């Protein structure tokens, strides 16, 4: 195939007079994946060479810094750990709907003299291009320092071998997972002293002997001497980089687009708008150009392909041709495609009498005994500490039960407990199911409509396969079986499927593929970047996020840890290249890339 230069997206002369800031690496997005890139480039676990000049890294984030420590988990505030259901409002306030179909039902009570639309229009952030039956209704994005890590559940399981791709061999996956777990602080002993954790584990191990019930891996640690938990987030990954003079974090700085050099096939500048800066009569004084040796886009599975589209990348063939019929080198058909999202079912139960009796009578240790001395049965019939930590348990993904389970108590944007019920008797069950990787499932971007930040409006086109629907039914049956052993349903929280997109685990929209396994044209047709997350055809542009995680397998578990693995791999590549220029040099395993091309993703 004949490719033309990047003439459609060459440097725009209108930006020529903008102030220029230079750095070695520009990271767009401040979630845990962007934080992983920053940490591994500036302070790698291995491979930093003494005497080398440390690279300069700038991180930009559209949203504001909303905590004293940049990117800290908001649930670390004691008030939310004392009143977990109040954290629901924090989650809801941190999520912004991605695509809302235009409502066509009229307001019949509107006074006749008042204006009203007579057809579909775009207002209040609605999207008239969205088919309501193909939408991920509950999908949302977070725009704040730390991204979704400021309110996530901190579940960090490794993908089962039936979920993860073979883009890396098993030894490399293990190495990357270990480093990711170290960065985010994954542990399985956080709740070892929780009474209800031990009770729920004991019940599940007795009733489901072949299911290997275990503590859910959590990116968290218990606060010494108190029944509080310190939840991990981007701030955990960044660590002391937040005080490093070589690292700069700019909040409320929005990357509007990338400018390319049509001679070198590189990103030459990123156009950044300071959203909070007052603007006087001088045009564009709130904008600057950042010139970086390497640019990393970590905006998440929707906002990353959105920025690429705004910058000139195209997925439709007719939009990518010049006047002579040559394809732009920014033509990547897979952009936005292969989108996967998990099905999700949910219920809440009130523990059975016999399990509550065990809570009341069993010897759970000195903390419980102290509580019983302080409060008699009339003061507290449950007889366990009021601040006993909530359980976090899982029945792991297997070939016969191919779904991820979280049997716990936590705050979501749904599932609050009525005040008349003792919250210590409530257990939530959340099941996450796979969806097959399908080329037809995608997110597209409008040429006409924009979001609140002037970026192309995303539109979903997503449908479950027949296999997905049947498997989700089996998943629901399994959840009902497990719930029935634990207790009876909390009224209003009976088993139910949740709105599409609520899992917030969209993957694959800029999927990776091992380079060299196919022809260049074929690789660009079915993927967006290589195993180091470098975009095809652009020498200095890397990606990060759930969007990089490829099929053909699909995941049911929380994919954050896996996305961090790709970021570690990409950072190793960038660090190695910077090392040649006198910054950092890194170690690379010769066996990192599996040369077997039968399963290259």
Swiss-Prot record:
Q: Which residues lie in Acidic residues bias regions?
A: 591-601
Name the EC number(s). Answer: 1.1.3.10
Keywords carried by this UniProt record = FAD, Flavoprotein, Oxidoreductase
Recorded GO MF terms: flavin adenine dinucleotide binding; pyranose oxidase activity
Q: Which cofactor does it need?
A: FAD
Catalytic reactions on record: D-glucose + O2 = 2-dehydro-D-glucose + H2O2
Q: Spell out the Gene3D superfamilies in the cross-references.
A: FAD/NAD(P)-binding domain
What residue spans carry the region label Disordered? 577-601
Q: What does this protein do?
A: Catalyzes the oxidation of various aldopyranoses and disaccharides on carbon-2 to the corresponding 2-keto sugars concomitant with the reduction of O(2) to H(2)O(2).
Report the protein name in the record.
Answer: Pyranose 2-oxidase
The organism is Emericella nidulans (strain FGSC A4 / ATCC 38163 / CBS 112.46 / NRRL 194 / M139)
């Amino acid at each position: 195939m004949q490719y033309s230069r990047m003439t459609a997206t060459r440097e725009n002369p209108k930006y020529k007079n903008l102030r220029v800031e230079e750095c070695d690496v520009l990271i767009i997005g401040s979630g845990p994946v962007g934080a992983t890139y920053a940490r591994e480039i500036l302070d790698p676990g291995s491979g930093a060479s003494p005497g080398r000049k440390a690279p300069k890294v700038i991180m930009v984030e559209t949203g504001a810094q909303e905590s004293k420590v940049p990117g800290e988990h908001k649930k670390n505030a004691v008030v939310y750990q004392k009143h977990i259901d109040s954290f629901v409002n924090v989650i809801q306030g941190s999520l912004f709907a991605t695509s809302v179909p235009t409502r066509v039902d009229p307001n019949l009570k509107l006074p006749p003299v008042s204006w009203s639309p007579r057809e579909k229009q775009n207002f209040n952030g609605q999207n008239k291009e969205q088919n309501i039956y193909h939408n991920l209704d509950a999908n949302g994005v977070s725009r704040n320092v730390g991204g979704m890590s400021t309110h996530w559940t901190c579940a960090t399981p490794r993908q089962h071998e039936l979920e993860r791709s073979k883009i890396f061999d098993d030894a490399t996956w293990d190495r990357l997972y270990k480093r990711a777990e170290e960065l985010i602080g994954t542990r399985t002993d956080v709740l070892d002293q929780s009474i209800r954790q031990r009770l729920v584990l004991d019940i599940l191990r007795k009733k489901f002997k072949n299911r290997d019930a275990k503590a859910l891996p959590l990116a968290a640690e218990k606060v010494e001497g108190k029944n509080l938990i310190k939840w991990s987030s981007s701030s955990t990954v960044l660590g002391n980089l937040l005080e490093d003079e070589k690292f700069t974090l700019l909040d409320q700085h929005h990357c509007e687009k990338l400018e390319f050099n049509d001679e070198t096939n590189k990103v030459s500048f990123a156009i950044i708008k300071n959203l909070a800066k007052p603007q006087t009569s001088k045009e564009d004084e709130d904008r600057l150009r950042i010139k970086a040796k390497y640019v990393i886009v970590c905006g998440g599975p929707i906002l990353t392909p959105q920025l690429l589209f705004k910058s000139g990348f195209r997925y439709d063939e007719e939009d990518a041709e010049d006047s002579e019929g040559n394809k732009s080198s920014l033509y990547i058909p897979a952009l936005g495609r292969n989108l996967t999202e998990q099905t999700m079912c949910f219920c809440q139960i009130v523990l059975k009498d016999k399990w509550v009796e065990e809570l009341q009578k069993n010897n759970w240790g000195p903390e419980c005994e102290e509580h019983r001395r302080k409060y008699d049965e009339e003061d507290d019939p449950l007889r366990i500490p009021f601040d006993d930590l909530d359980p976090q348990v899982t029945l792991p993904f297997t070939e016969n039960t191919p779904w991820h389970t979280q049997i716990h108590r936590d705050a979501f944007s749904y599932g609050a407990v009525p005040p008349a019920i003792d919250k210590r008797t409530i257990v939530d069950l959340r099941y996450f199911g796979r969806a097959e990787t399908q080329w037809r499932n995608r997110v597209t971007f409008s040429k006409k409509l924009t979001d609140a930040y002037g970026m192309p409006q995303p539109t979903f086109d997503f449908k479950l396969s027949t296999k997905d629907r049947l498997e989700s039914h089996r998943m629901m049956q399994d959840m009902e079986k497990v719930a029935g052993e634990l207790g009876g349903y909390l009224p209003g929280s009976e088993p139910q499927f949740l709105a599409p997109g609520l899992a917030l685990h969209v993957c694959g929209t800029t999927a990776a593929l091992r380079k060299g396994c196919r022809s260049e044209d074929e690789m660009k047709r079915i993927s967006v970047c290589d195993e180091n997350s470098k975009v095809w055809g652009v020498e200095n542009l890397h990606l990060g996020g759930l969007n990089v995680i490829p099929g053909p397998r699909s995941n049911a578990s929380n994919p954050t840890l896996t996305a961090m693995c790709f970021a570690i791999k990409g950072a190793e590549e960038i660090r190695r290249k910077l090392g040649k220029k006198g910054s950092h040099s890194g170690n690379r395993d010769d066996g990192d890339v599996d040369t077997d091309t039968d399963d290259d993703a």
